[in-house]
Design a protein with these regions (language model features):
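Radical SAM enzyme [4Fe-4S]-AdoMet core and its adjacent flexible, acidic
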Residues: 98, 121-124, 128-130, 134-233
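Conserved alpha-helical substructure of the radical SAM core
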Residues: 2-124, 218, 222-226, 230
């Protein structure tokens, strides 16, 4: 029976890729809270913190039938900062009750405060690291952000060393030379894996009301003369 379900789900995923109709969504990304507790230089989400939007228990419960229909196995809670939603763990409980795993993408500022609940309701955590301590704090415009992240990761790992915590780093002209320190810091924290992605400077992502003008893009985008240095890292 399980084999037939798996085969059907694989077919539905294939069908989704081959047509313009969604038949399968194994992973769904939700934004429980639109505001953020960082002020990152490469992101505009925090600039709209006053216009708060957040998901409720009713919102999540209302999605369950569709998630079941599309064969969803995992929900990634993104943001903004998902942990700013006061009912965040109730949302996770509803999803877990439907057999759906929850992953959390977070700034990491408050994971120590929520460690017990995270270990209970969230399958894994993905934190953001932008550099070593001074650079991370500067890019996020939050003094002490790095140490709060480090303390949170360390505490959770001390409770459950096998709990999976990974990191992602957005690479841009302010931190590309700090690539190796990022890896070293992640190792020292006990983070299981680090992934890297380039900064998006030209789309409407990250709550941009309009695409950045070229002068703003060049504050974040690597210049041509910096590429040789990037290749040496």
């Amino acid at each position: 029976m399980i084999g037939l379900q798996s085969l059907n789900h694989t077919y539905q995923r294939y069908r989704t890729l081959q047509t313009h109709r969604i038949s399968a969504l194994p992973i769904v990304i939700l934004m429980p809270h639109s505001a953020c507790n960082c002020r990152c230089v490469m992101c505009d989400i925090w600039k709209d913190n006053k216009n708060l939007k957040q998901l409720t228990e009713q919102d999540i419960s209302g999605l369950l039938a569709s998630l079941k229909q599309f064969g969803t196995k995992q929900v990634v809670m993104s943001g903004g900062e998902a942990l700013l939603n006061k009912n965040f763990f109730r949302l996770c409980e509803i999803l877990n009750g439907a057999g759906i795993k929850v992953s959390l993408l977070t700034t990491g500022l408050t994971i120590k405060n929520h460690a017990e609940q995270l270990l209970k309701w969230v399958s894994d955590i993905i934190v953001s690291i932008d550099g070593d301590q001074p650079l991370h704090d500067a890019i996020r415009n939050i003094p002490g952000a790095f140490n709060k992240l480090k303390d949170g990761v360390g505490y959770i790992k001390s409770v459950n060393p096998n709990y999976r915590i990974t990191a992602r780093t957005v690479i841009h002209r302010l931190n590309f030379w700090n690539w190796i320190p990022v890896i070293n810091e992640a190792k020292q924290m006990g983070i299981d894996q680090v992934s890297f992605l380039p900064a998006d400077v030209s789309s409407h992502a990250f709550n941009r009301q309009m695409a950045w003008e070229e002068p703003k893009q060049h504050e974040i985008l690597l210049s041509e003369h910096e590429l040789p240095e990037l290749k040496t890292i």
